[in-house]
C-alpha cells in the first residue's frame, strides 16, 4: 500500500524461527551486540557464544547490507568469519565506522562517506551512542533514500530515551 516506506523490524535471538522471515527483501540487517544474557535461552548443551552467533546470523542471506556492532573484537571477528561467504556488503564497527567523544556536547562519527560532528543526543549511556552510530552507519549505506547529513544531524537531536531507560520526572512511579 505504501511502497516508499521502510519498515524497521526487530527479531530476537531465534530469528530463523521468527515470523519476520516472511520478508524476502531486506535492505539491511543489523547484528546488535551479542551478550552472554542470551545463553540462558539456549539448550544446556548449546550454551556458547558461537551458538548465539549462529542463531543471529543464519538468516542474513537475503540482506543487501549487514552492519555489525559488537562489544569485543573476538565476537566481531567470529561474526565476520561466520558471514564471510555471504555476498552482502559488510559494515563492521571499529573497522568500517566508528565514533568518538571529544567534547562534552558533541560526538564524532566516521565511515566511508566521511566524518560528521554531531550534537550528542539526549542519552545517558555510551552504549546508546554506539547504537546511534550503528543507525547512522546503516542509513548512510541506504544511498537510494537520499538521507542527508543535515537529516541525520537534525534527527539525532530529537532522540528521546523512553521506556526501559526513561528518566521519570514526576508522577506516581517517580514517587515510589
Regions found by a protein language model. Name each.
Residues 74-85:
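Short, aromatic/basic amphipathic alpha-helical patches
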Residues 5-6, 18-30, 35-39, 51, ...:
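Nucleotide phosphate-binding/pyrophosphate-handling subdomain across enzymes
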Residues 83, 88-89, 133, 140:
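Conserved AMP-binding/adenylate-forming
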Residues 2-74:
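Flexible active-site lid/hinge loop adjacent to a nucleotide/diphosphate
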Residues 101-116:
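Acidic-glycine-rich active-site phosphate/pyrophosphate-binding loop
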Residues 97-102, 173-174:
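A short acidic, often aromatic-flanked loop/helix-cap motif at beta-alpha or helix-coil junctions
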Residues 89-95:
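A conserved beta-strand/loop element that lines the FAD pocket in flavoprotein oxidoreductases
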Residues 1-4, 99-101:
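Feature captures the FAD/FMN-dependent oxidoreductase FAD-binding
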